């Protein structure tokens, strides 16, 4: 498929056009027509109904939903993607509410600042969806994409979306979407590209605190940061003057290894080794909330259950439905840039960290090996990291 850049899509939306937005191939892997409510024209919903034929929905911000008392359609949402459908609506000035004209009227009234909850009949023929406050950075769905795109065009935070179906009633994917794009001369973007666009456009971290932190390995400066869009908390330990070509360790949080000294992994040993090195030579440790290579603590324990049944650390992740490594290093790169660091010496045995930082503009001048002893309990784990994940150990 041939995708367009985000800026060209924003211009098209602001001109009242409809675009195609494609989500992740591991999610729905489908394309929706998306329009911005404030800019869309009288033919937009008719085009969606005639050409796309999916369910026409109206993503809105939480503020709009709360102001108009758009309550959730069900109390117990069991949708696998957590789509926040509200009760369906028609504006009171409509008749049946189903015509393209009347659904357009209802959508436009959603963003009218003079509209009140009493101005909408329930149920109706337009289906509002409530977007997460932090948009695609919190949830990579079409709902959030539509509201984010509206905001990026300077419009009120609301859109209209419709899934694209083939003539035979199946969902359009891949080359079907490409043909639809070419037939109707539409811009087509991915939610992944929208996520990256927002990451580059907006700061993702906030500095919160700095303290002296005495430890068993020396006294460090500890900085506290908050991830703007996920509310995750990140701490950074530094020793000595901060400079270019800083010695840097990116350490993914490991409760079992770092705190309980588990011998299933080498995480705790690597952290202690890095703290000793940084205390002696100066540098920085960025402690990232990426438990279990990004799958979280409880899923890591589930992976351990599978390992006890004969899986390894990679096949266990895959069996649980995850990639072998979900970590992203954009936050780490943002923290380095906060300290005006673009060139580092990286304490790591993991090549993916090198590539992960390079894609966000961080130059790795030198790799510093982190040497820790194996134990009888983590031998197979270490071998898997070396053979299947390419770790330099």
UniProtKB/Swiss-Prot annotation:
The keyword rRNA processing does not apply. Pathway: Cofactor biosynthesis; riboflavin biosynthesis; 2-hydroxy-3-oxobutyl phosphate from D-ribulose 5-phosphate: step 1/1; Cofactor biosynthesis; riboflavin biosynthesis; 5-amino-6-(D-ribitylamino)uracil from GTP: step 1/4. The record marks 125, 163 as: Essential for DHBP synthase activity. One of its GO terms (biological process) is riboflavin biosynthetic process. Pfam families: DHBP_synthase, GTP_cyclohydro2. GO terms for cellular component: cytosol. Zn(2+) binds at residues 254, 265, 267. D-ribulose 5-phosphate binds at residues 27-28, 32, 139-143, 163. GO terms for molecular function: 3,4-dihydroxy-2-butanone-4-phosphate synthase activity; GTP binding; GTP cyclohydrolase II activity; magnesium ion binding; manganese ion binding; zinc ion binding. Its EC number is 4.1.99.12, 3.5.4.25. The keyword Nucleotide-binding applies. Mg(2+) 2 binds at residues 28, 142. Residues 1-200 are annotated as: DHBP synthase. Residues 201-393 are annotated as: GTP cyclohydrolase II. NCBIfam families: PRK00393.1, ribA, ribB. HAMAP family: RibA, RibB, RibBA. This is Riboflavin biosynthesis protein RibBA. It comes from Staphylococcus aureus (strain MSSA476).
